[in-house]
């Protein structure tokens, strides 16, 4: 699984019935810009099951933090919402995304719209 780095879950917080967040260890070599997302996932039947998640923690933090909605029948989220401290999680080695300040054109107003967790990318 060279595409992924195995990290360890450090904390899990269930905010309410539909939202949760978790932090993981972070490979020292992982570099990303604020606004990037990473593929994260779990190994299921010997294969990675992964989806794109915005990184909530700033790029200078020692750990990674992610925020998610709970999807009862979601292929990954239904499993991810049940992780515990100490569990292993797969984190992609290649950050990507275009929600970067440097990509925005100067303007008087900035409107940020999103779906799902809403505030996670901001």
Region locations from a protein language model:
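FNR/FR-type flavoprotein reductase catalytic core
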Residues: 75-122
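Ferredoxin-reductase
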Residues: 2-85
């Amino acid at each position: 699984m060279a595409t992924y780095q195995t990290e360890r879950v450090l904390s899990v917080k269930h905010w309410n019935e539909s939202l949760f967040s978790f932090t993981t260890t972070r490979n020292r070599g992982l570099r990303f810009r604020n606004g990037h997302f990473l593929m994260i996932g779990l190994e299921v039947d010997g294969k990675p099951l992964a989806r794109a998640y915005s990184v909530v923690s700033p790029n200078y933090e020692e750990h990674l933090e992610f925020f998610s909605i709970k999807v009862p029948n979601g292929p990954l989220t239904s499993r991810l919402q049940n992780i515990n401290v100490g569990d292993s999680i797969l984190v992609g080695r290649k950050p990507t995304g275009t929600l970067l300040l440097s990509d925005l054109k100067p303007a008087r107003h900035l409107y940020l719209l999103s779906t799902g967790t809403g505030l996670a990318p901001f």
